[in-house]
């Protein structure tokens, strides 16, 4: 019988298990002489001496990319028409497709990387692939001027990966911690899970934010869900996952978009016309409009309130008739109390035909939602990064000056459909 089994296994028509497939839990014992591989991320597999796809190159780093992205023949420079007059002329285009935003990750050798502005490669809803290149070129950053009172950028750690940063934890009551700016020199690693089970959660899923701790433990922080009866996208964010309403005790704030889904506003739990506890602007997320339908990864601008010398946010109230909100200050170039962040431009890999970013092992799947936020004064200091690890699980890491609520709201804006952006 054993001889028959060995002969049958040697038959060319048999399908053998690939090393690149999803590894399921197995016993530590070798059965029938098979070598058992433990998967601990792309870098762990690539360092294996038995890697079948290993290609020895002269100093060329190995890059984990997502293939299948096609290139366009149009060379253009993306613009940012943010004025109200331009937004009124926008025509709706296609929305996000959950089937197109995630691509299996292949292990391929990297070639020379080019900035998509200089190389002219633009692809529709192009997924951004996680790369294992620790030396992301500064030349690939957007050359757009930004300012703002972000005094910690020049004194922050130069390591974009955050290996020198301490991992943060909750300090004090969770309701207060989620709105407090992150401590300097601390990296907060979080996970966002999307729950689409139930009658109406296919259209209105619930998003949960957990802070990751040692030994695989997680601490619940926030939950968010889009309101059903609203003319525009309106997300309620709360510390109470059982009561996602504005009247709940755990209500922290909300995320609201304009009609086209190009601009998102983040507010705290204050009331608009209440002089005692007025509603404050905590962030504005602006996505570049895509009038001509050119294809490529998203471009986004994030506006935050400036920071004081004692690491507290400047209070900005857009509902105050005597003051300016974040968006109005940005349009009028009054940036003294505004921090402007941009998404880090992914590098176009000509050989793999995909855009790549170095997420330092925190992102494992290509997605149009993957992004990193940086300040123009220090492109190596990643203020926030967000990316996909499975169909409904995403990682979200943030640093000073963001708080957990701001970072979670920015991530929620990436999930929302955008008529004029893609």
Curated annotation (Swiss-Prot):
Main location: cytoplasm
SUPFAM superfamilies for this protein: Tubby C-terminal domain-like
GO biological process, one term: protein localization to cilium
GO cellular component: cilium; cytoplasm; nucleus
Pfam families named among the record's database cross-references: Tub (PF01167)
Entries under InterPro entries matching the protein: Tubby-like_C, Tubby_C, Tubby_C_CS
Protein name: Protein king tubby 2
Localization terms from the record: Cytoplasm; Nucleus
Coiled-coil region(s): none
Gene name in the database record: king-tubby2
Family per record: Belongs to the TUB family.
């Amino acid at each position: 019988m054993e001889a028959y089994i060995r002969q049958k296994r040697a038959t060319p028509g048999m399908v053998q298990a690939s090393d690149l497939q999803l590894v399921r839990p197995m016993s530590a014992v070798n059965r029938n002489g098979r070598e058992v591989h433990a998967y601990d991320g792309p870098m762990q597999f690539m360092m294996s001496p038995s890697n079948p796809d290993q290609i020895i190159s002269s100093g060329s780093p190995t890059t984990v990319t997502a293939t299948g992205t096609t290139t366009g023949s149009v060379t253009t420079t993306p613009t940012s028409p943010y004025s109200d007059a331009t937004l009124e002329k926008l025509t709706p285009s296609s929305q996000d497709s959950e089937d197109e935003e995630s691509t299996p990750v292949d292990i391929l050798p990297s070639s020379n990387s080019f900035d998509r502005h200089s190389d002219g490669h633009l692809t529709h809803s192009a997924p951004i692939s996680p790369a294992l290149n620790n030396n992301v070129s500064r030349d690939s950053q957007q050359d757009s001027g930004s300012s703002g009172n972000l005094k910690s950028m020049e004194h922050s750690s130069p390591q974009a990966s955050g290996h020198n940063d301490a991992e943060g934890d909750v300090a004090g009551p969770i309701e207060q911690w989620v709105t407090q700016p992150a401590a300097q020199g601390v990296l907060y690693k979080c996970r966002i899970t999307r729950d689409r089970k139930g009658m109406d959660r296919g259209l209105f899923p619930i998003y949960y934010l957990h802070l990751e701790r040692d030994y695989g433990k997680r601490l619940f922080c926030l939950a968010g869900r889009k309101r059903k009866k609203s003319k525009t996208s309106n997300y309620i964010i709360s510390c109470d996952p059982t009561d996602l309403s504005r009247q709940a005790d755990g209500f922290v704030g909300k995320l609201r978009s304009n009609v086209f889904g190009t601009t998102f506003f983040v507010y705290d739990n204050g009331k608009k016309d209440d002089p005692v506890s007025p509603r404050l602007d905590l962030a504005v997320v602006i996505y570049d409009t895509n009038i001509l339908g050119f294809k490529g990864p998203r471009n986004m601008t994030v506006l935050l309130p400036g920071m004081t010398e004692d690491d507290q946010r400047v209070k900005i109230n857009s509902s105050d008739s005597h003051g300016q909100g974040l968006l109005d200050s940005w349009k009028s170039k009054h940036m003294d109390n505004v921090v402007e962040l941009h998404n880090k431009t992914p590098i176009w890999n000509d050989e793999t035909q995909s855009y790549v970013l170095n997420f330092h092992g925190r992102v494992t799947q290509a997605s149009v939602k993957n992004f990193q936020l940086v300040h123009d004064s220090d492109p190596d200091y990643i203020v926030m990064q967000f990316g996909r690890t499975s169909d409904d699980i995403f990682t979200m890491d943030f640093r000073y000056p963001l708080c957990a609520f701001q970072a979670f709201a920015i991530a929620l804006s990436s999930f929302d459909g955008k008529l004029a952006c893609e």
